[in-house]
């Protein structure tokens, strides 16, 4: 009888143990590394002070234990959890070093099911959770698959106004007079491509988000490869599309076209076939605050980047993405990060603003039956809330330490617009977002957070039932 029960248990084990591959990405400086570090830290400390009341399995005391286990794919770098934790608990505390490529960490979550049928056969189940971190810049490359070289060139050069126009001056000067039909000059093309890469790096340093091709700023082991030595044709209209289309692969324009096609076919498709195809759930982190600080060009650039990124999540049967990869993602969460960098009364506005930015995608996802949500969170809470008296008026404020020099600050950053800001908002410039470093924290206690448990409930809660 005991042997029969053991065999039945083993059979049920195979039936109820679950595997979930969660992808984490975000626009530049959105806090991906801090998010994953904090999420893992909370789960590993469910019996040591973790605050996760919104995760139903914890609230109902059904999550029995969590441990790290070896990842299945030995070819993917390990996520630097321990290193990130050491930085957060350091003296002085620091934000974790951002990751620059794909990395992964794997957890086993042991839980009691509240499913009556499963409970009848088995006391506990296990969820194997694989958390995969990858750069948002790579996701932003996906729309290139729906373009040819000349249409992509038009889009890129069409952005070169305002500050982008200033920052691209060297590239435009170097590409001046380049003959599309002349025999390919590889050295000159490499030099001009380097100038385009410098321009993209400058855009990223200045807080812009729409950067293509994404691998140019995060090349990894592809640094110096000809696949990363192309750039948009600078003056499509001057030469005319028909003439440029005639350029064979041994000409300047032809070689750039060939490299663009190779990049799309091998690099972009390769990433999505090897990684994205295997994701079950996806969270996209967005920092809405820094662009509000930087001005209308930075904010509109973030909006453009999100619009492009959303093209990656159009799940309709007829879309390019569906035809190529048949993705299985069934839940998509957008999170406005750094909720601790604004006062509590502005949290709802943060979420509302992000909802406005992704409204079209939300409608598409709902139509396709994809479960999608939007929330505000702070992976690691860096400030405390309080009330200050200003000329007899009590207003909410934040206390923390400034990121640049650690100086203590008490500030009211201002109001976050609940809708896409118009010219009146920019004219007033009443919002002043300050970057904070992490608080000094007790190494024996889990990291403080805001609504990280709400994100966990949406992303994995149904798998722990």
UniProtKB/Swiss-Prot annotation:
InterPro entries recorded: YcjX-like
EC number: 3.6.5.2
Co-factor requirement: Mg(2+)
Superkingdom of this protein's organism: Bacteria
Keywords tagged on the record: Acetylation, GTP-binding, Hydrolase, Nucleotide-binding
Binding of GTP, residues: 28, 31-34, 95, 99-100, 338, 340-341, 380
Keyword set includes Transmembrane: no
Binding site for GDP: 31-34, 95, 99, 338, 340-341, 380
Motif (Walker A motif): 26-33
Activity control mechanisms: Alternates between an inactive form bound to GDP and an active form bound to GTP. Likely activated by a guanine nucleotide-exchange factor (GEF).
Catalyses which reaction(s): GTP + H2O = GDP + phosphate + H(+)
Pfam family, one: DUF463
Keyword GTP-binding: yes
A molecular function (GO) term: GDP binding
N6-acetyllysine modified-residue sites: 249
Enzyme class name: hydrolase
Primary role: Binds GTP and GDP. Has intrinsic GTPase activity. Does not hydrolyze ATP. May act as a transducer of stress responses.
Oligomeric form and interacting partners: Monomer in solution.
Family: To H.influenzae HI_1637.
Protein name: Ras-like GTPase YcjX
Organism encoding this protein: Escherichia coli (strain K12)
């Amino acid at each position: 009888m005991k042997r029969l029960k053991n065999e039945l248990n083993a059979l049920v084990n195979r039936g109820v143990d679950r595997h979930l591959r969660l992808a984490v990405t975000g626009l530049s400086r959105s806090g991906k590394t801090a998010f994953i570090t904090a999420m893992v830290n909370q789960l590993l400390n469910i019996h040591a002070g973790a605050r996760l009341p919104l995760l139903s399995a914890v609230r109902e005391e059904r999550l029995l234990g969590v441990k790290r286990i070896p990842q299945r794919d030995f070819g993917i770098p390990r996520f630097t959890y321990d290193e990130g934790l050491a930085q957060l608990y350091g003296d002085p505390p620091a934000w974790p070093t951002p990751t620059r490529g794909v990395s992964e960490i794997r957890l086993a979550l042991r839980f009691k099911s509240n499913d009556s049928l499963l409970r009848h056969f088995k006391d506990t189940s296990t969820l194997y959770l694989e958390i995969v971190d990858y750069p948002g810049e790579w996701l932003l490359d996906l729309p290139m698959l729906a373009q040819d070289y000349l249409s992509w060139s038009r889009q890129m050069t069409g952005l070169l106004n305002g500050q982008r126009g200033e920052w691209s001056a060297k590239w435009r000067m170097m590409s001046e007079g380049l003959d599309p039909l002349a025999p390919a000059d590889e050295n000159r093309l490499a030099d001009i491509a380097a100038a385009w890469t410098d321009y993209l790096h400058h855009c990223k340093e200045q807080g812009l988000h729409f950067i293509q091709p994404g691998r140019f700023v995060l090349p990894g082991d592809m640094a110096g490869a000809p696949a990363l030595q192309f750039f948009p044709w600078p003056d499509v209209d001057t030469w005319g599309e028909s003439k440029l289309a005639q350029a064979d692969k041994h000409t300047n324009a032809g070689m750039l076209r060939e490299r663009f096609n190779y990049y799309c076919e091998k690099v972009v498709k390769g990433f999505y076939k090897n990684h994205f195809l295997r994701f079950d759930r996806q969270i996209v982190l967005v920092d809405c605050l820094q662009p509000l600080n930087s001005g209308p060009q930075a904010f509109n650039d973030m909006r453009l980047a999100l619009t492009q990124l959303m093209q990656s999540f159009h799940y309709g049967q007829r879309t390019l993405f569906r035809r190529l990869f048949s993705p299985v993602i069934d839940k998509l969460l957008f999170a406005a990060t750094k909720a601790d960098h604004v006062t509590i009364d502005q949290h709802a506005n943060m979420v509302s603003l992000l909802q406005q930015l992704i409204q079209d995608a939300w409608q598409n996802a709902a139509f396709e039956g994809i479960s999608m949500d939007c929330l505000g969170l702070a992976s690691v809470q860096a400030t405390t809330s309080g009330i200050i008296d200003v000329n007899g008026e009590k207003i909410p404020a934040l206390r923390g330490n400034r990121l640049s020099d650690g100086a203590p600050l008490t500030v009211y950053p201002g109001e976050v617009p609940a809708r896409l800001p118009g010219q009146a908002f920019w004219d007033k410039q009443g919002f002043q977002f300050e970057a904070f470093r992490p608080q000094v924290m007790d190494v024996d206690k889990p990291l403080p957070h805001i609504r990280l448990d709400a994100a966990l409930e949406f992303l994995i809660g149904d798998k722990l039932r």
